[in-house]
Amino acid sequence: MMSPPMTTTLMFILNYAIISFHGQPSGISWGNHIETAEAAAILAMANRELRSRELLLWTSGSTHLLLQPILPLPLCLPFPLVPASIFKKMMLPLSAFSFWM
C-alpha cells in the first residue's frame, strides 16, 4: 500500500526536525528532539496523516517527542530544507490540535 503524498505541513515538520538534529546518526536511526508542545502536537497529527512505517513517534517527556525515521534521511526527505524560524512562525497553538489527541 502506498503512503499518501507528503503535505506542506508535514514537509515543514520534517525540515524542522532536520534543522533541530543533534547527536550522531547510528546506522539508519536518526534522532531529533522537538522540544515544544506545539511541535509535539503537530508531529502527532502528521504521524497519523502519513499512515506509513516511515516514521516512528513516541513520547520522551511531557513536552516533546522523539522523531525517528526508519529510512536514512536522504531517502525520507527529498525536498529542500527550510529555516526553522519559518516553521515556528507557522505553528498553531497546541489547543488547535487538541481534538486529534
Swiss-Prot record:
Residues spanning the signal sequence:
1-23
The source's superkingdom equals Eukaryota
Residue ranges annotated as motif RxLR = 48-51
Transmembrane among the record's keywords? Answer: yes
The UniProt keywords, alphabetically, are: Host cytoplasm, Host nucleus, Membrane, Secreted, Signal, Transmembrane, Transmembrane helix, Virulence
Listed transmembrane segments: 67-87
The membrane topology noted for this protein in its Swiss-Prot or TrEMBL record is:
Single-pass membrane protein
Quote the subcellular location field of this record: Secreted; Host cytoplasm; Host nucleus; Membrane
- Give the primary localization class: secreted
**Mind telling me which GO cellular component terms the entry cites?**
extracellular region; host cell cytoplasm; host cell nucleus; membrane
Induction text: Expression is up-regulated at the earlier infection stages.
Role this protein plays: Effector that acts as a broad suppressor of cell death to interrupt plant immunity. Inhibits cell death induced by cell death-inducing proteins, including the PAMP elicitor INF1 from P.infestans.
Question: What domain notes does the record hold?
Answer: Has a conserved RxLR motif that acts to carry the protein into the host cell cytoplasm. Lacks the 'so-called' EER motif, which is found closely behind the RxLR motif in most of RxLR effector family members, but the presence of an EER motif is not always essential for the translocation of every RxLR effector into host cells, or for inducing a hypersensitive response.
The similarity annotation says:
Belongs to the RxLR effector family.
In its UniProt entry, what is this protein called?
Secreted RxLR effector protein 64
* Originating organism: Plasmopara viticola (Downy mildew of grapevine)
